[in-house]
Amino acid sequence: MAAQNGNASFPANFSIPQEHASSLPFNFSYDDYDLPLDEDEDMTKTQTFFAAKIVIGVALVGIMLTCGIGNFVFITALTRYKKLRNLTNLLIANLAISDFLVAIICCPFEMDYYVVHQLSWEHGHVLCACINYLRTVSLYVSTNALLAIAIDRYLAIVHPLKPRMNYQTASFLIALVWMVSILISIPSAYFTKETVLFIVKNQKKIFCGQVWPVDQQLYYKSYFLFVFGIEFLGPVFTMTLCYARISRELWFKAVPGFQTEQIRKRLRCRRKTVLVLMCILTAYVLCWAPFYGFTIVRDFFPTVFVKEKHYLTAFYVVECIAMSNSMINTVCFVTVKNSTMKYFKKMLLLHWRPSHHGSKSSADLDLKTSRLPATEEVDCIRLK
């Protein structure tokens, strides 16, 4: 079932003929359950599992509330007000849409899987594959969108004299972000299966996750390393280089000529934007690096976790850290990066105060601005 980005293999004392369980990128495997099938004990009834269930339940509720409400506010404000539609915000909208879909579609099913039915899937194979697939696509859309934002900021700040990305190019880039994510995620749906596990006597759990055939283990590991390279290492390295050059340009390079108040405001605005984006990059690395590291050790050095009592607890802790990344993105983009809440409050006031018919308010005029929205810097200065 969908959890966060990872993969898995069977423990040494349990296997199914002709199959090798994996979960790239959003699944548990049989050993993730930490269920010793040769003992008369249901590990889902232990205190360790109970604590882990509470932790992941709280995390899922947090994602549903934060990402569901926060991204809805951002998307609604962006749709209504053209002043918010600069190129950076349009790229951010991809993260908002993907996280919003996960919050309202995937998380309720995950809550049922982890907390209500305690690692047992009750919704059929089609939904099992769809939820895993949507989770995977969402992760890669977020990663690719963050990379696109970093490159856009790099070109705008380090090479200001070069032509800026126009909306045709931005539309192509957004389509590319989704297309790459959709294609790379296909194996997560293709290899997703339901498998019945008998835990204690006649008690059963229905496992939902990717199951790769034994004779395709090499393909699985190659696929994981490919995804790890182009969806984590590559983007993180590129974004780090971009923000390093941007930081040098904004903080360590003298601005020639006389600095007007408008120039100083634009510089402060750019610095604020870049600081938020660097914080988001840092959060992305801190949240996902432990999970990728855990996954690599589990799949490429499986003996490390053999006989490990607290394997399940460690897996849940690492998973919850990874899951929190979407909440951090939402909080940063909605409450810090943009004036989204200001525009959303405007929209609510317009809805609940119909008495403004006689005169056009500034909020009304926002809807009738030019088709060419203000750049991020001009918009930032105007909102000061």
Swiss-Prot record:
Where exactly are the transmembrane stretches of this chain?
Answer: 54-74, 90-110, 138-158, 172-192, 224-244, 274-294, 314-334
* InterPro entries with a match to the protein in the record: GPCR_Rhodpsn, GPCR_Rhodpsn_7TM, NPY_rcpt
Gene3D superfamilies with a match to the protein in the record: Rhodopsin 7-helix transmembrane proteins
What residues bear carbohydrate chains?
N7, N13, N27
Tell me the residue ranges located in the Cytoplasmic compartment per UniProt.
75-89, 159-171, 245-273, 335-384
Superkingdom: Eukaryota
Q: List the disulfide bonds.
A: C128-C208
> Which controlled-vocabulary keywords does the entry list?
Cell membrane, Disulfide bond, G-protein coupled receptor, Glycoprotein, Membrane, Receptor, Transducer, Transmembrane, Transmembrane helix
Report any Pfam family annotated for this entry: 7tm_1
Main subcellular localization, coarse class?
membrane
The record describes its membrane topology as: Multi-pass membrane protein
* Entry's Gene Ontology BP terms: cellular response to hormone stimulus; circadian rhythm; G protein-coupled receptor signaling pathway
Side Extracellular, residues: 1-53, 111-137, 193-223, 295-313
Coiled-coil blocks: none
Tell me the GO molecular function terms: G protein-coupled receptor activity; neuropeptide Y receptor activity
Tell where it localizes: Cell membrane
Q: What does this protein do?
A: Receptor for prokineticin 2. Exclusively coupled to the G(q) subclass of heteromeric G proteins. Activation leads to mobilization of calcium, stimulation of phosphoinositide turnover and activation of p44/p42 mitogen-activated protein kinase.
The subunit structure is: Homodimer.
Q: Which PANTHER family match?
A: G-PROTEIN COUPLED RECEPTOR, PROKINETICIN RECEPTOR 2
The family note in this entry says: Belongs to the G-protein coupled receptor 1 family.
Q: What is this protein called?
A: Prokineticin receptor 2
Q: Which organism is it from?
A: Bos taurus (Bovine)
